[in-house]
Amino acid sequence: MQNGPFHLPAQSKIAHAHLNVRNLDKSLTFYVVLIGLKEAYQYKNTAALSATGETPYHLILSQPKNAAAVNQRAAGLFHTAIRFPTRKALAQVITRLLRYRWPLQGASDHGVSEAIYLPDPDGNGVELYVDRPESQWPKTDGALNMVTLPLDISGLLSEAPENEEIPAAVDPGTDIGHIHLQVTGTDRAETFYHQVAGMDIMQRYEPGGVFFASGGYHHHIGANSWNSQNGPSAGDNSLGLKSFAISLPDKNAWFQLQERLIKFNYPVSKIVDYGYGLGLATADLDKIQVEFLTEKSKFSREDLAGLDGEKIKEFK
């Protein structure tokens, strides 16, 4: 392992979110027809979606048997944030949502981004956003200072005029920009995501909010305890967030994370084989399931042969 503090590589980012849903067909209608993601895989009660209809996946939906209702006080998902590459791409999706009369819950200018908030069919929070150029991000004494101001929604929607045809699919450059978690304490989130996983703390939002990122991004993970301070841990079979994955750029980072999880007593429950990548699965202090994912092509045959075969589980 390297000397000095461990930092997650700058190229790290959110790979995907995996949600438990009550009705897979209804969720597919929302995420495919209304949002515009494409189905890349389906097997029994699980479907995987992406911006292109190919791997890597951006959103995975599973319909478990006898799923428990979300405990609003428990750790879990605050929202999944779908990031669009241009204002026009975001405006087109918002226009489609308005045409379908899907309810919107909020619209904010965060300085670093323009964002719309809405629920999916199960009430899971969804953010749709586009980043501003980094040169425009607000800072105070050199430190990032995200804000929450009213969004100029009319200005944004002008990017998708009424007389223009709205494409059925999202822009292929769309991805999951960040995950915002509901946690039982931001100190617990800092212990795992900063001290163990090596993400930088970009901003604290008092009371009860903190934002983590790698590579100077405004945030890849948000964590707040506004509704869940000292609440219960995440449930194993509840609706909402089943897991999420952080993409690592190379095998060295993957093996370093494996060593750190062992060192700090975070059990690796399994290695998820997605075909295109391997996800090192563990859980944070709130039992939120997290995977560290690296492309399979980054590993040598010797690397793969040296893995614990009993822990490798094929994604289905």
Residue spans for each PLM region:
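N-terminal beta-strand motif that seeds the catalytic metal site of vicinal oxygen chelate
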Residues: 1-25, 79-80, 135-187, 241-246, ...
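An N-terminus-focused feature that recognizes amino-terminal "leader" regions
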Residues: 1-68, 74-82, 95, 223
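Vicinal oxygen chelate
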Residues: 11-12, 19-25, 81-124, 183-188, ...
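Exposed loop/turn and edge beta-strand positions of beta-sandwich/beta-sheet ligand-binding modules
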Residues: 43, 76, 112, 175, ...
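Conserved small-residue-rich
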Residues: 31, 168-213, 223
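Conserved acetyl-CoA-binding loop of GNAT-fold acetyltransferases
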Residues: 34-40, 195-202, 262, 266
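Active-site-adjacent scaffolding segments
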Residues: 46-111, 116-127, 136-142
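Conserved short beta-strand elements that form part of the metal-binding/catalytic scaffold
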Residues: 38-73, 125-132, 200-238, 273, ...
